[in-house]
């Protein structure tokens, strides 16, 4: 039962911040800080009391250290299905830590609409935690989209003009268009996977464990894998679909930049590890050379362009493109050590 609370804490905390602004402008800051500290402490407690592994062996089936399942839209086989293992817990620990830091970063910087700012900040973090816990694909998509709208408001309302002179509205709109387009591709891939599985098994379900057993025709399998890859590649971001990141990073408030580079990019890498590779193992193996080539291009392109930047935030954005290239290569290298290295780099970046 603790898993829903990991998601509810940021959402409830955000609502309380919005309400509390009417009484005292400093109160939302303290509520946001308390919410993030509570999330981080709960994550540490789970880490200390559990026995976790990064991922089970392929032959052993799925083993969740903690699991929560509640019917939601039964007609379409959609449930509130949450699962926690070592990989998702590491990401939630990182989210809690950077959540605390992002509240501190915004303490003096944000002076207008403090309550609404912290509502958006905490709802981004709540959506991220939901992404890391969801093992129903519709629920995963729901949280994936939910964390994007507050990020748009964060950039559009509290951002500032970067060194290139582009406005915060332009950067926010570019971010929104790129991420919504990738979200649409992901939705089509999820619906395609569910439909093909329904045709072969007669069971309509969005559950991760059931879809892992889906028997997919070779061409369809590759096409659906590409849909997932493109959706995650935009968010990661992978060259050449990276152009939204430098603008969004430069124009975002400091707390937004912390969340963007520190957490949001990792949701895409997590999605590749959790969904793209296990759901489409053979197609992913065929596609691996292309993915690793894109990662290699990203490493050098991001590093060289970072050298030319005079704005610190844009420099960090391009270095993020470079670092996520290493993560992409690690994910598609096909060895346990490479995956562990990718996770370590995701934590360290």
Region annotations inferred by a language model:
Residues 1, 79-90, 133, 225-229, ...:
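Hydrophobic alpha-helical transmembrane segments of multi-pass small-molecule transporters/permeases
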Residues 1-2, 16-119, 205, 209-213:
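Transmembrane helix-loop-helix hairpins at membrane boundaries of multipass inner-membrane proteins
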Residues 1-8, 26-37, 83-93, 115-119, ...:
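Alpha-helical transmembrane segments of integral membrane proteins
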Residues 4-19, 34-46, 92-106, 124-125, ...:
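Central hydrophobic cores of alpha-helical transmembrane segments in multi-pass inner-membrane proteins
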Residues 10, 85, 136-156, 204-206, ...:
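Functional transmembrane alpha-helices
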Residues 19-23, 27, 51-52, 108, ...:
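Membrane-interface elements of multi-pass transporters and channels
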Residues 23-25, 119, 123, 127-216, ...:
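Alpha-helical multi-pass transmembrane bundles of energy-transducing inner-membrane proteins
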Residues 49-78, 164, 168-172, 177, ...:
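Juxtamembrane/interfacial segments at transmembrane-helix boundaries in multi-pass membrane proteins
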């Amino acid at each position: 039962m603790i898993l829903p609370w990991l998601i509810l804490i940021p959402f409830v905390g955000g609502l309380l911040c919005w309400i509390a602004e009417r009484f005292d402008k400093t109160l939302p800051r303290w509520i946001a800080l308390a919410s993030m500290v509570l999330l981080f402490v709960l994550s540490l407690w789970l880490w200390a009391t559990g026995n976790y592994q990064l991922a089970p062996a392929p032959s052993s089936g799925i083993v969740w250290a903690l699991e929560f399942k509640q019917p939601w839209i039964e007609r379409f086989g959609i449930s509130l299905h949450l699962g926690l293992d070592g990989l998702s817990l590491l990401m939630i620990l990182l989210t809690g830590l950077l959540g605390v830091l992002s509240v501190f970063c915004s303490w003096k910087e944000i002076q207008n609409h403090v309550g609404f700012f912290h509502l958006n900040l905490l709802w981004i973090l709540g959506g991220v935690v939901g992404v890391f816990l969801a093992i129903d694909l519709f629920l995963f998509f729901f949280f994936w989209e939910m964390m994007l709208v507050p990020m748009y408001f964060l950039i559009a309302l509290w951002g500032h003009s970067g060194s290139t002179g582009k406005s915060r509205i332009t950067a926010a709109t570019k971010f929104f268009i790129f991420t919504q387009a990738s979200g649409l591709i992901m939705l089509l891939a999820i619906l395609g996977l569910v439909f093909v599985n329904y045709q072969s098994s007669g069971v309509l379900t969005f559950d991760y464990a059931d879809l892992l057993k889906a028997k997919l025709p070779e061409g369809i399998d590759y096409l659906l894998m590409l849909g997932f890859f493109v959706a995650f590649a935009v968010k990661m971001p992978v060259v050449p679909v990276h152009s939204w990141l430098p603008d969004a990073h430069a124009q975002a408030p400091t707390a937004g930049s912390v969340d963007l580079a520190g957490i949001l990019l990792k949701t895409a890498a997590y999605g590749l590890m959790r969904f793209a590779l296990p759901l489409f193992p053979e197609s992913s193996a065929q596609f691996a050379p292309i993915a690793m080539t894109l990662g290699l291009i990203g490493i050098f392109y991001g590093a060289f362009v970072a050298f030319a930047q005079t704005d610190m935030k844009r420099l960090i954005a391009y270095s993020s493109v470079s670092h996520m290239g290493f993560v992409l290569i690690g994910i598609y290298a096909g060895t346990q050590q490479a995956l562990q290295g990718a996770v370590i780099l995701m934590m360290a970046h």
